[in-house]
């Protein structure tokens, strides 16, 4: 038997008073989904254990048959696996967002976070800025002392790796949950290494405020990427092999590094069709064709649709 599994990431949402208490999914006109529901079997599943934060990382791990309570170490190691980053014992991976902070002469802690994605910065520009930052002698010296390197990611999402880092007790806060707030109470705390991360964030803001690339972004009416933000920390993770466990081969259709990483860790194939962006402008036709093509030689085709999360202001 052939299987197609569709993940509408964030599609369920929550009841909205303006929609008469319905969720966006309940309110939407969706004749094909309604027909499938009427003719098929419908049920409920808890993809995120009650004791863990709800997110694409924990939910998709569950969907792939990996209990987050047993295997989850953080989001960043999953994204790191997408690009083949190998974490050694003692290494810690962080998501390193390019963000937009208030400009001006305010003390660093008094600045507000204006965008967790630097205005959904273009990937090539984001790569150029983060490369410029880690190549700057001042910043490179601080990063080397911290044992930190950076790996280019997708759009505003980069992966930083710190060797021999002790993160016991550390508290790193997701930036997308605190837009418009002063960053002082949101900065890393909880252990000595938190001070190191804060030092890197302060130095990055100081240097990026002077970046000619950011000056051009501002001149073009765009948000500058004048800060970095560490979160989603975690250590190396090993997930059970999907094929050995379920006796089915398959592949994942997605443009999102998180999905690519989980797929790689469980031994499933990865397909990112032309035009698949992980954003609202993605090419659905190519994604669907890729889903069908996978089934020619496999049992399972999993298509991840991340666009519902992009319709919210807090996509991360």
Task: Label the predicted regions.
Residues 229, 234-302:
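Long, well-ordered mid-to-C-terminal structural blocks that present hydrophobic/aromatic surfaces
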Residues 117-227, 233-235:
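Glycine-rich, mobile lid/loop segments that gate access to catalytic sites or pores
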Residues 1-4:
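Extreme N-terminal starter segment of soluble prokaryotic enzymes
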Residues 304-316:
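Single conserved hydrophobic/aromatic residue that forms the stacking wall/gate
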Residues 36, 221, 303:
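A residue-level signal for conserved active-site and pocket-lining positions in enzyme catalytic cores
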Residues 6, 28-31, 124-128, 195, ...:
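Conserved active-site and cofactor/substrate-binding residues in soluble primary-metabolism enzymes
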Residues 12-138:
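Active-site nucleophile/metal-coordination loop of metallo-enzymes that catalyze phosphate/sulfate
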């Amino acid at each position: 038997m052939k299987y197609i599994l569709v993940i509408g990431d964030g599609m369920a949402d929550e009841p909205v008073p303006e929609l008469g208490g319905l969720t966006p999914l309940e309110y939407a006109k969706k004749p094909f989904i309604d027909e499938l529901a009427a003719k098929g079997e419908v049920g409920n599943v808890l993809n995120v254990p009650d004791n863990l934060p709800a997110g694409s990382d924990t939910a998709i791990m569950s969907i792939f048959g990996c209990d987050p309570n047993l295997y989850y170490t953080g989001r960043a190691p999953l994204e790191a696996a997408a690009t083949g980053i190998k974490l050694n014992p003692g290494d810690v991976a962080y998501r390193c967002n390019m963000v937009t902070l208030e400009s001006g002469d305010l003390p660093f802690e008094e600045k507000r976070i204006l965008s967790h994605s630097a205005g959904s910065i273009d990937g090539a520009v984001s790569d150029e800025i983060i490369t410029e930052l880690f190549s700057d002698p001042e910043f490179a010296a601080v990063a080397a002392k911290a044992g930190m390197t950076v790996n280019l990611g997708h759009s505003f999402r980069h992966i930083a790796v710190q060797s021999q880092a002790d993160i016991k007790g550390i508290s790193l806060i997701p930036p997308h949950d605190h837009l418009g707030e002063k960053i002082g109470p949101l900065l890393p705390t909880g252990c000595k290494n938190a001070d190191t991360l804060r030092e890197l964030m302060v130095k990055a803001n100081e240097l990026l405020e002077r970046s000619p690339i950011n000056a051009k972004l501002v001149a073009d009416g765009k948000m500058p990427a004048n800060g970095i933000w560490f979160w989603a920390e975690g250590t190396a993770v090993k997930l059970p092999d999907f094929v050995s466990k379920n006796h089915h081969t398959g592949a994942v259709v997605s443009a999102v590094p998180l999905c690519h990483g989980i797929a790689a860790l469980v031994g499933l194939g990865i397909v990112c069709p032309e035009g698949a962006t992980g954003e609202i402008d993605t090419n659905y036709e190519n994604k669907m064709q890729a889903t069908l093509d996978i089934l020619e030689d496999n049992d399972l085709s999993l298509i991840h649709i991340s666009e519902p999360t992009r319709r919210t202001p807090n996509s991360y």
